[in-house]
Amino acid sequence: MFSRRSHGDVKKSTQKVLDPKKDVLTRLKHLRALLDNVDASDLKQFFETNYSQIYFIFYENFITLENSLKLKGNNKSQREELDSILFLFEKILQFLPERIFFRWHYQSIGSTLKKLLHTGNSIKIRCEGIRLFLLWLQALQTNCAEEQVLIFACLVPGFPAVLSSRGPCTLETLINPSPSIVDAKIYPEEITPLLPAISGEKIAEDQTCFFLQILLKYMVIQAASLEWKNKENQDTGFKFLFTLFRKYYLPHLFPSFTKLTNIYKPVLEIPHLRPKPVYVTVTRDNETIYSTKIPYMAARVVFIKWIVTFFLEKKYLTATQNTKNGVDVLPKIIQTVGGGAIQEKVPELDGAGSTEQDKSHSNSSTLSDRRLSNSSLCSIEEEHRTVYEMVQRILLSTRGYVNFVNEVFRQAFLLPSCEISVTRKVVQVYRKWILQNKPVFMEEPDKKDVAQEDADKLGLSETDSKEASSESSGHKRSSSWGRTYSFTSAMSRGCVTEEDNTNVKAGAQAMLQVFLTNAANVFLLEPCAEVPMLLREQVDASKAVLIIFRRMIMELTMNQKTWEQMLQILLRITEAVMQKPKDKHVKDLFAQSLAGLLFRTLIVAWIRANLCVYISRELWDDFLRVLSSLTEWEELITEWSNIMDSLTAVLARTVYGVEMTNLPLDKLSEQKEKKQRGKGCILEPQKGTAVGRSFSLSWRSHPDVTEPMRFRSATTSGAPGVEKARNTVRQKATEVEEFQQAESTAAADCDYLVVGQQQVPRSSSTSDITERLYSDSSQGQKVEHSQNLSSSEPKSVQESKGHVTHEHEGITMLVRRSSSPAELELKDDLQQAHGRCRQRQTSESTGSDTVVGYSNEAELPVSPWQACEEDPDLSTPTDAVADSDARHWLQLSPTDASNLTDSRECLADDCSIIAGGNLTGWHPDSAAVLWRRVLGILGDVNNIQSPKIHAKVFGYLYELWYKLAKIRDNLAISLDNQSSPSPPLLIPPLRMFASWLFKATTLPNEYKEGKLQAYKLICAMMTRRQDVLPNSDFLVHFYLVMHLGLTSEDQDVLNTIIKNCSPRFFSLGLPGFSMLVGDFITAAARVLSTDMLAAPRSEALTLLGSLVCFPNTYQEIPLLQSVPEVSDVVTGAEDVKHYLINILLKNATEEPNECARCIAICSLGVWICEELAQSASHPQVKDAINVIGVTLKFPNKIVAQVACDVLQLLVSYWEKLQMFETALPRKMAEILVATIAFLLPSAEYSSVETDKKFIVSLLLCLLDWCMALPVSALLHPVSTAVLEELHPSRAPLLDYIYRVLHCCVCGSSTYTQQSHYTLTLADLSSTDYDPFLPLANVRNSEPIQYHSSADLGNLLTVEEEKKRRSVELIPLTARMVMAHLVNHLGHYPLSGGPAVLHSLVSENHDNAHVEGTELSSEVFRSPNLQLFVFNDSTLISYLQTPAEGPAGGTSGGSLSDVRVIVRDISGKYSWDGKVLYGPLEGRLAPNGRNPSFQISGWHHHTCGPQKDLFNGEEGDDVLDKLLENIGHTSPECLLPSQLNLNEPSPTPCAMNWDQEKAIMEVILRQSAQEDEYVQRCNSDSSVTVTSQGQPSPVEPRGPFYFCRLLLDDLGMNSWDRRKNFHLLKKNSKLLRELKNLDSRQCRETHKIAVFYIAEGQEDKCSILANERGSQAYEDFVAGLGWEVDLSTHCGFMGGLQRNGSTGQTAPYYATSTVEVIFHVSTRMPSDSDDSLTKKLRHLGNDEVHIVWSEHSRDYRRGIIPTAFGDVSIIIYPMKNHMFFITITKKPEVPFFGPLFDGAIVSGKLLPSLICATCINASRAVKCLIPLYQSFYEERALYLEAIIQNHREVMTFEDFAAQVFSPSPSYSVSGTD
């Protein structure tokens, strides 16, 4: 309609506007042009100058248009003209407020506005009228009349009529009042609609809400549009309107609006539970919407949203965003009406990132389309930013307004569930105020203001306090506004009263208290479980409130009153929400949804509060009362356990100086250290974000305070050992704390972390608290420590900011910590203390340089309180993860600078708040007390009604105890492994739960699962090493509980105790422990007699096996009850022994579990040794041997192998066995022979390798028995009933041994009548031995594949090789055994000692043709040496050496000796031979007699009769004497009749006289014939020759003559020997292979490391530096073997040096089959680093370690760093001179005996049992090596290679020539 004019046209337009001659329409057009082109300041001056003409122009045009509209109707041009006129009207009201204030054109303007406000107008005109009316009313302010006030009160339809002096008023009656006098002639004209509503116009469903929004919006945006000369009047205008609104509308919107809300003097009454309202369902747009029947609820929501708009971040839009396609026909201020105003688009902070719609009050499309805008009431146009900020400032400008806003927000918390989305918006406002930008009223007031307020003591709220007496707060609206409304009366009614009290600073604490109190209403509304959507809304709102609560807990500094209010509110909420539902079958979904979050918040708040302020005992009692009444909630137990985990981590750090996430023992793992070095510490919080369940939003690092302190303990009833209430203030730590007897005897008294000089007297319920007490240098001296002193916490992360994402919040918000005033004040204190901390800061962890640095703001991802708070099913993370998250909430608020105080200063000056001091934050006393109190916060856990939850609590107690035990294990650990730290001063209370546990065992059977957990923990608690011995009261209670458990009828209880109470309990030697021995035996027997699959059978037999030595040690063991099979037993070892061994015997034959069966057999073996060592002669020894012997033929080879090991162990006790019964050692050998014969047929053809290997084990065991038994025992005839019947002449045992060996070599099918040839099992039957004792089967364990194909290379080739060797294994072993017996039986040990088994002589020794000292090629050129192969299995060297001297009657120096060197699979042997018969002095030997040889060993043994062999008379029969001598020296050559070889055999018993006479006649006839033939020849001259004389003796000169002579005597040159006797090719390759063969061992070798650990040694250096041990240790080492001088030792060295660098001596043990060298750490030098390194190399490389530990703590494998040490056998000396054995092995190592993990043995048995166990362990380790070969297998392979490659095939003639004279022409330089 109007176009823009240039600047030159402004003056012309001004003249035309003021020209009265122009018509009013023209003047209006020019005036509009001026409005568009002139600045506001110039316009105001223009309007003030020409106000009368301007109003005239407006009014005339308005009247004209009004008449035109009535006549012509509504069309577009007229509507546009109306817009222009109203635009002018608006400008008049805006530019002339001062005149309007004085009622300028009062009636005219009022009449015009009434026409616009007429209810018959269109919505657009009515909205415009409201806007212009509010402008006029703001200008009039207090000069308005009652009518204007009443019109304002009626602008929003739907409210009740306003009471006035005229009576009830509505907008209609105010616009067209009925005439007061019916007959009056003069009355106002009737006001009609200016622009009536057209049909089809969109009308809001809820017009009350719509017009209320319009009114509220225009109250704001019109407030600053009046151009007052005095700008302050803008504020006054809004305040005037707002006062009217509060007076007329507020009582209806908020009937319960109270004037008592006052954040300056808050009323903090805790709200009560409210019943749920009745909800009405409405379906709108196919969506169900819920509402209530509460009047004006929708309007109430609109008003609250309007208030919220001023305090949330608003979305400002530019003007162009509100135009549509450039159509801007209405004034901008009209266009912003926006019908969708209800749909506020406030950015949601707690939703999913999208806007939240209030679906209950949607009023879309209420205006014409062109008036719709994209904005909402929360989306404000940019030009209105200032006015919204102005109103916000006004609402926070006075105390009255501040209280009013907080009361409105309180009302929002009271909304029903269907409107709770508005409550969440209010929560967002508080969140912003509390956590981000504090409003002015939350700033701290000045001190003088505070003092003034305290003096004033105002009684009423300052919210309209002066209206309190005159205004009614009921539903009826009344007005006391008179017709002459004056400024004074307005002031008296609160319009401007607030100006008197503009000091709005109330401080944050009061605001927080009010918020806490009001926000509780969200929880205290009865949830609507019937409507899931409403329930979900309430849950979300509750969680949003809890998030703020938790942020307050974590991030804000609160005073004691605020903390107490928070705790009381949380208690009230928890009690109300979590109360049991009346109907137990109905689930309380609301409580379930909040349970975990609420419980966690409550407990954490309690912890944080106690770190910051003093919390009274009454509050603690309430806390205990509430939580102990809610133990039926599983979520409570879950959160309690999680928080206890975190508190335990803090306890570990602050009291014990241990980080649970970085334990010293974990750090000792090299692999973990590498991993940690690769990580950056800055990423640690991310782990919490990913998997954490902590609710922390704090970024502070853990304080590193580890200084122990003295302090009070917790005060929580129901916890085990809780202290009595103390009414006196705790004395300072510099004073000596005195303990009164009255305190110490109370069951509730317990100070479990005390550093003092004397031990505190304790009762039975508190004696379990473990502690160490060290005396100070003087009484009362301040405790100080040189280590673990913390300076300050690293703050580099604490002040960081990060993105925090909540599940309730869809957006990401950047949180930044800002220093509070308290922080700034603390900085000064810190600077003063800086000097004291400087010394510590130099040695503290990184980050201590940021003690007070709050400027580091690196952005970090921060773990939320709970990334998955709404998912209670998520599993609890591992310790490390939980601790990493828990570190946040366990820190203090940002002002927690007191943690920076040195603990030493704490001791001297103060203590924590919880202990009565002033220190805030985590300190040793606060950590311990809070840990204690939170532990007991569930009350007596045995009062929990739910068995499931009871079991869960006790299950967690076990986990918690395990953490405490882990802390204990990590105290005083050497991190560098170079030195051992001193013992810790404080240790965790590992017996703290005892009273709970003891009581739990007495509960009814429905609590069975919890009882089992209690028993499990009791066993774990009492099988640990006890740092402090329990007192007698505790032990009595403990023994009673254990007795009742062990004698319980419940099998599960028995199983639990037996499974968890290891033999370590017996090793502890607690006073009176032996009284439980009988109970344990009985209980173990009952466990073993059950058929339950889950029964702890192995553990039961381990317990029984550990007790086998006890009856002999404790001569009379008291029993608490009689044992079965023995009546009325009270004491006595024999009865216990008999009962125990019967159980072992039974289970050694019937036990179905493989491992348990092995343990039973080992236990029997240990017991047999014990009885033999003690010479007890127990009759059941034979029964035990019977069981072991029968087990040898058991199908399960693992079990059978254990029995074989036990038999091999008994070899060393053969003399004791012989003393026990003479025939028993022979019986052992017989058992082995018969078992081999029994198993051989099946093993030969078995495809299972273990079958063959077991036969090998039996053969080697038989060999050991043969070598140990005396020859007389082996030659003793086998006496059995069967043999006596079949064979009257019984063969000796040795014969049967050779027979079975022959069967092994040649095959079991060699003899058809095997039973007649070898011993059978039936032959063993006797009264003492039953070879057919029945054995129950066992469940075979699956064979473990230890090696992959990648480890073995070509698996196919390996398997083929293993198969080939397996076939040959039994024959090869049997050949070795026979060779060993032939060579060593009766000879071993030789005079050189057991270290020398095979010959050290080679072909170069005593060889006159060789000059070198080593075997070299020169040897092969010797004419006196020849090498042969015999039977393709043995190498034989014949060497002729010079004679050493005269032997018998030989001529001195004329003869030589013959040396035979034999190499076979069993070893290398050398025999020297001398000529026994030869020429005497001057005489030859008789005709036809060849020289013979006497064979002796290398050491030239000679026998007595041999010396006189040639000194007899001439007529003596020398042959007769020779035969006699052979029978004397080699009794094995005697005939079975035992007659001497020179004695005639007896007459055959079956020959009669006639037969004898016939034989004599035949012999005589033959003799006569021979004589006749001789005579006939003598008489015949043809056969007569000349007689020849005896030739003279010739001395042999050939260098190989005597060797050839011996070969000839042995028959080696004969044709029948030719195929088995060959020469060897002499060449360099043969030389190398001979050297290699000679370097191989001829016995099984083992090297064992032995360590000694003294008390207090836990590091490598200390252990390796030990040069001697205790006497018991030295005796043990001496019993392992015998000391050998390494410089001269000829046996196995195990890598030790002869030069003394590895020690001078070492223990050495050997039999004819085994050599063991012990690398003893105390025998090796440790005088230098190089020596230590060499010592560690030798000891560490051994596969088996023996550790003798006298330390008070268990040995850790990692102390000696090595990749070897597959098996560690640790010996712990006990108080009763017995020894507890633990065996740790890698999992792939198979079972071995005779000792087992948990065995307890006496000192007499220890060395032999340890030695045997080490040998078996070494064998078990070696069997894992692929293709491992025993020594004889290796020798056999080498011999086979030599024979195949170097055997020379030649004709007999060539062979004879080489034998006659070894040819020197054979080249050894390079021939093959």
Swiss-Prot record:
Residues 350-370, 445-481, 711-730, 758-813, 831-851 are annotated as: Disordered. The modification Phosphothreonine is found at residue 715. Residues 1634-1842 form the Rap-GAP domain. Abundantly expressed in testis, pancreas, lung, thymus, brown fat, and white fat. The modification Phosphoserine is found at residues 373, 376, 379, 486, 696, 819-820, 1592. Keywords: Cytoplasm, GTPase activation, Phosphoprotein. It is found in: Cytoplasm. GO terms for biological process: activation of GTPase activity; Ral protein signal transduction; regulation of exocyst localization; regulation of protein localization; regulation of small GTPase mediated signal transduction. Residues 758-768, 775-795, 840-849 have a biased composition (Polar residues). Pfam families: RALGAPB_N (PF20412), Rap_GAP (PF02145). GO terms for molecular function: GTPase activator activity; protein heterodimerization activity. GO terms for cellular component: cytoplasm; cytosol; nucleus; plasma membrane. InterPro entries: ARM-type_fold, Rap/Ran-GAP_sf, Rap/Ran_GAP_dom, RGPA/RALGAPB_N, Tuberin/Ral-act_asu. Catalytic subunit of the heterodimeric RalGAP2 complex which acts as a GTPase activator for the Ras-like small GTPases RALA and RALB. Component of the heterodimeric RalGAP2 complex with RALGAPB. Heterodimerization is required for activity. This is Ral GTPase-activating protein subunit alpha-2. The lineage of its organism: Eukaryota, Metazoa, Chordata, Craniata, Vertebrata. The gene is Ralgapa2.
